[in-house]
């Protein structure tokens, strides 16, 4: 009988562990299945990166997450795109270290916790709204 009791104790311990592990695996599989995939945004919508669309208005109401992609479509002969610091954003001037894009179809993948200040070198376009400020939140 003592041997039988040892076997029962072993089963009594391992079966609940196996059940807990199975439930945990199912929970994780479900979480992965429903994990948010990055979203690609065409900045400015159908009009693209153009002063006819006030970009802060376009961005208002949208929530951006790390991993999301901002795609900027524009006429590269008329416009460009620069990522600047807050001062550059407020003054519509490129700061030291600003990153310029000029292909006409540029993509920026957002990193968690970063504030993005994006504008154009053309001061008159920048001051009339061809700029935007966003922050990338933690992915969900």
UniProtKB/Swiss-Prot annotation:
<dbReference type="InterPro" id="IPR041844">
    <property type="entry name" value="Plantacyanin"/>
</dbReference>
<keyword id="KW-0325">Glycoprotein</keyword>
<dbReference type="InterPro" id="IPR039391">
    <property type="entry name" value="Phytocyanin-like"/>
</dbReference>
<dbReference type="GO" id="GO:0009055">
    <property type="term" value="F:electron transfer activity"/>
</dbReference>
<feature type="glycosylation site" description="N-linked (GlcNAc...) asparagine">
    <location>
        <position position="85"/>
    </location>
</feature>
<protein>
    <recommendedName>
        <fullName>Early nodulin-like protein 22</fullName>
    </recommendedName>
</protein>
<comment type="similarity">
    <text>Belongs to the early nodulin-like (ENODL) family.</text>
</comment>
<feature type="signal peptide">
    <location>
        <begin position="1"/>
        <end position="28"/>
    </location>
</feature>
<dbReference type="InterPro" id="IPR003245">
    <property type="entry name" value="Phytocyanin_dom"/>
</dbReference>
<dbReference type="InterPro" id="IPR008972">
    <property type="entry name" value="Cupredoxin"/>
</dbReference>
<feature type="domain" description="Phytocyanin">
    <location>
        <begin position="39"/>
        <end position="138"/>
    </location>
</feature>
<feature type="disulfide bond">
    <location>
        <begin position="92"/>
        <end position="126"/>
    </location>
</feature>
<dbReference type="Pfam" id="PF02298">
    <property type="entry name" value="Cu_bind_like"/>
</dbReference>
<comment type="function">
    <text>May act as a carbohydrate transporter.</text>
</comment>
<keyword id="KW-1015">Disulfide bond</keyword>
<keyword id="KW-0732">Signal</keyword>
């Amino acid at each position: 009988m003592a041997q039988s009791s040892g076997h029962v104790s072993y089963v009594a311990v391992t079966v609940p562990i196996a059940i807990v592990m199975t439930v945990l695996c199912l929970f994780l599989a479900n979480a992965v299945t429903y994990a948010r995939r990055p979203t690609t945004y065409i900045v400015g919508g159908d009009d693209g990166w153009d002063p006819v669309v006030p970009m802060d208005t376009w961005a208002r109401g949208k929530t951006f997450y790390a991993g999301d992609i901002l795609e900027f479509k524009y006429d590269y002969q008329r416009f460009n795109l620069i990522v600047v610091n807050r001062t550059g954003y407020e003054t519509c001037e490129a700061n030291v270290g600003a990153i310029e894009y000029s292909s006409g179809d540029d993509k920026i993948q957002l990193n968690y916790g970063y504030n993005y200040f994006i504008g154009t070198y053309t001061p008159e376009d920048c001051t009339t709204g061809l700029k935007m400020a966003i922050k990338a939140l933690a992915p969900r």
